[in-house]
């Protein structure tokens, strides 16, 4: 029996939809986009390269508040300022560098590398310096960010102006806003010199230190590096320490004078790229090899804690110092810091270590929480950076939501890179990001690739706006906080990984660096609210033309599916084909398909 379905109801109205006649499938020329990146450090330089390399019809500008590139590695010039990750693991994958002068580099070495990258790829053409973002507001009607900027040219009054963009990339990082100690009298009572390690003055060097009584506040990485640099030269050094420190060894780095690469080694790396890659991979294997030690009660955690406690005791001979510096928390709760020179410096005759907080400053010195005043000429604040993740300027998203308010108590991001209510916005090194395990370079590349995928999707599908859903973001952060309970970061310690008032861990990704890279390899678009520039979201299909169709004639390969790469060797052998010939033809300019079976049966 045949059943006929009869449409009931009014006849459909004539569609008001009109297909865009000149739209071509997947053609970037369909839509020009403007991108603003904030900051020209490692992340901003990376995005300048990625957009130049992978995109078309994109207008990209990088605004940098400083006078040049480099971010942290431009501004941090305190004595011995450097990176505790091996040089060859601290490079872009597209720009492995044979000429690193030493195994662990100083800030000036790293800046020189970044300068060479920008020169090689002409990336400064996208950058505007001495230009600071002071406000960013999302315009829902236009589907764009309006960005207010302040430019400070030398010898001129500051100039404010507006710009706009479809995508806003925040590459400010977490080490860009120095944090001063909240110490009464530090700035308004003390008559001596006050210095922050993140803004070390050019006129304070060995000559000025020679007879100074110097106080250092803090026991993090900048303190550990700076103390070792100034101790041999100052008249006297007072160091104020509130918490124990894990003096670790990171991929062979003890903080002591590092291996210098010979000219012969550098020449080999230049002439043999495979040797350079092999050396870099061997370092990465070491850098990422400690992941298991961060889980509570694991054998790796217990073994690492015992080893480094014993190692510290063998170097620090003074019982009081050894007891004060030995942590009461697990290995890795605070960032592991190579510090052999520091451990030797604190035992010298011109050094006093005070295991007390700083209570206040007098005109002539520092009063500790123990009530004792120490007379000093200079105070060095090695107090790190504001790590609350709150932006330094207003970022106003949908419905007037200010990211500074949204993140006032608990900074929560989607996969460490996006935020609900902040459309078309990606941040680098956001909350819950793999800052704790190995070099940041591979995860940074993954975030840049993630941003490129969204940028291309906006172009190809004429997307107006996208932002992660609040509910899915909440569930992700619920997972993060539950995961933390199983790790060393749940221990009681003061760390920039945490909100030290509440104890909440804000910085850590719930897994290894490799885990993060795998998770964000492809965006989960189902986690996003997406709106389109056209009323009909299928308008980007156009009149059915592809770029190959438009090219036509002999210029177009209208059968790209027919190629050697798609022939499975198993099939070819089963029908009597010569697999060796197939492989040789592929090797002339092709590779075997990733999904091809390699069985020879």
Swiss-Prot record:
Superkingdom of this protein's organism? Eukaryota
The protein's required cofactors? FAD
**Molecular function terms in GO for this entry?**
flavin adenine dinucleotide binding; monooxygenase activity; N,N-dimethylaniline monooxygenase activity; NADP binding
Q: Provide a GO biological process annotation.
A: sterigmatocystin biosynthetic process
EC main group: oxidoreductase
Look up the record and name the pathway of this protein: Mycotoxin biosynthesis; sterigmatocystin biosynthesis
- Effect of disrupting the coding gene: Impairs the production of sterigmatocystin and leads to the accumulation of averufin.
List ligand-binding residues for FAD.
42-43, 64, 73, 84, 90, 133
Report keywords, A-Z.
FAD, Flavoprotein, Monooxygenase, Oxidoreductase
Q: Where is this site: Transition state stabilizer?
A: 335
What switches on expression, per the entry, is described as: The genes forming the sterigmatocystin biosynthesis cluster are co-regulated and induced on oatmeal porridge or the fungal isolates were grown either on oatmeal porridge or in YEC medium (0.2% yeast extract, 5.0% corn steep liquor). Expression is positively regulated by the cluster-specific transcription factor aflR that binds the palindromic sequence 5'-TCG(N5)CGA-3'found in the promoter.
Q: Does the keyword Oxidoreductase apply?
A: yes
Please tell me whether the keyword Oxidoreductase is annotated for this protein. Answer: yes
Assigned EC number = 1.14.13.-
Which family would the database say this protein is a member of?
Belongs to the FAD-binding monooxygenase family.
PANTHER family xref list: FAD-BINDING MONOOXYGENASE STCW, L-ORNITHINE N(5)-MONOOXYGENASE-RELATED
Q: What does this protein do?
A: FAD-binding monooxygenase; part of the gene cluster that mediates the biosynthesis of sterigmatocystin (ST), a polyketide-derived furanocoumarin which is part of the most toxic and carcinogenic compounds among the known mycotoxins. The first step in the biosynthesis of sterigmatocystin is the production of hexanoate by the fatty acid synthase (FAS) units stcJ and stcK. The polyketide backbone is assembled by the non-reducing polyketide synthase stcA by condensation of the starter hexanoyl-CoA and 7 malonyl-CoA extender units followed by cyclization and release of norsolorinic acid.
Designated name of the protein: FAD-binding monooxygenase stcW
- The record lists the organism as Emericella nidulans (strain FGSC A4 / ATCC 38163 / CBS 112.46 / NRRL 194 / M139) (Aspergillus nidulans)
Q: Taxonomy-wise, where does this protein's organism fall, top ranks first? A: Eukaryota, Fungi, Dikarya, Ascomycota, Pezizomycotina
Gene that specifies this protein: stcW
